[in-house]
């Protein structure tokens, strides 16, 4: 959530930044007008309360002196009625301010490229060279069925579209991947966490999914619970409402969890395969950092995600998302896109973001600065390290052989009991 004081004192800068994120200046102007009216009413309310206190004292004195206080009482009742009217106005204005400010996206960092959509994203670097196949490559969904390791037909029967069963070495490959990813992140100083897979609405507000993106989630009927769309939500909210010791920062968390997404608005996109599912495993990275260190931590987090792809030998590129393509809470985002041979393109496999103090303000996560003893908002960061199903897709396609088998990447073999290849039955 944005700082209302910042909008008030630096309106033009905030308006220009949010314009690049698709927010009309009229929206901010209306917010500013509401804020000004609110502040005026607060002053009036305080003045009337002071007047009421004086009147109350005068009434008390008149009664002590056995004097008639009828007029003073009538005057005080009128003042009290005026205060109640103003307070009701303030409640209504506060709700309007909340309705606007809670759906405003974060302001982009100055280094973020300005653009409307993914066409305006900027490639930063590439790693690895896509393999030159001397045979016709298969899509990962065909490989999965031919190898009897992925079953979409029964997934659809048991649940519905965008669900599947992992089987045999497919299930083992998925498990090997997330164990490998977690182990690599732990080496880099991340604390492993097993989170709840359901969170409450306050947690969804804290990380920015609510109220704007409720349609993208699965809520449990007649409860306050939501299935997590990412482990970012429980990990970030771990410290919601707390004040941390500045000497403890930065703090790194990592977790593997299922993620549940309704994929509203994705009809017709990636209807086959592992790219877009309603339920998938993802290894998440979350950091809590001091403001002056958060962009250095973003570079480190991105490198942690890249490390996984490099050790798996998967070609990828790093993209800096433009203002029009970033997520709601992000101030800056790097996407990692892995090479998918059957599609002859790179597809997103990780997204690493610095939200600055946007989530921390919503969730009230603060720290006491050891330098001056003041309590301040910290910065939160999150990143995929990696989306496991998409990594399976990338391995199946990049490591496929002409005979229909798939070679298991060397770093995963210790996690798979020494298996080296997945062969057709």
Curated annotation (Swiss-Prot):
Binding site for L-serine: 230-232, 284, 384
Cellular localisation: Cytoplasm
Top-level taxon of origin: Bacteria
GO biological process per UniProt: selenocysteine biosynthetic process; seryl-tRNA aminoacylation
Main location: cytoplasm
Any GO MF annotation of the entry: catalytic activity, acting on a protein
This protein's GO CC annotations: cytoplasm
Reaction(s) catalysed (UniProt annotation): tRNA(Ser) + L-serine + ATP = L-seryl-tRNA(Ser) + AMP + diphosphate + H(+); tRNA(Sec) + L-serine + ATP = L-seryl-tRNA(Sec) + AMP + diphosphate + H(+)
Residues engaged in binding ATP: 261-263, 348-351
EC number: 6.1.1.11
First-tier enzyme category under EC: ligase
Entries under Gene3D superfamilies matching the protein: Bira Bifunctional Protein, Domain 2, Serine-tRNA synthetase, tRNA binding domain
Recorded metabolic or biological pathway in which this protein acts: Aminoacyl-tRNA biosynthesis; selenocysteinyl-tRNA(Sec) biosynthesis; L-seryl-tRNA(Sec) from L-serine and tRNA(Sec): step 1/1
Alphabetized UniProt keyword annotations: Aminoacyl-tRNA synthetase, ATP-binding, Cytoplasm, Ligase, Nucleotide-binding, Protein biosynthesis
NCBIfam families associated with the record: serS (TIGR00414)
PANTHER family noted in UniProt: SERINE--TRNA LIGASE, SERYL-TRNA SYNTHETASE
Entries under HAMAP family matching the protein: Ser_tRNA_synth_type1
Subunit details: Homodimer. The tRNA molecule binds across the dimer.
Family classification: Belongs to the class-II aminoacyl-tRNA synthetase family. Type-1 seryl-tRNA synthetase subfamily.
Domains: entry comment: Consists of two distinct domains, a catalytic core and a N-terminal extension that is involved in tRNA binding.
Biological function: Catalyzes the attachment of serine to tRNA(Ser). Is also able to aminoacylate tRNA(Sec) with serine, to form the misacylated tRNA L-seryl-tRNA(Sec), which will be further converted into selenocysteinyl-tRNA(Sec).
Name of the protein this chain belongs to: Serine--tRNA ligase
Source organism of this protein record: Streptococcus pyogenes serotype M12 (strain MGAS2096)
Phylogenetic classification of the source organism: Bacteria, Bacillati, Bacillota, Bacilli, Lactobacillales
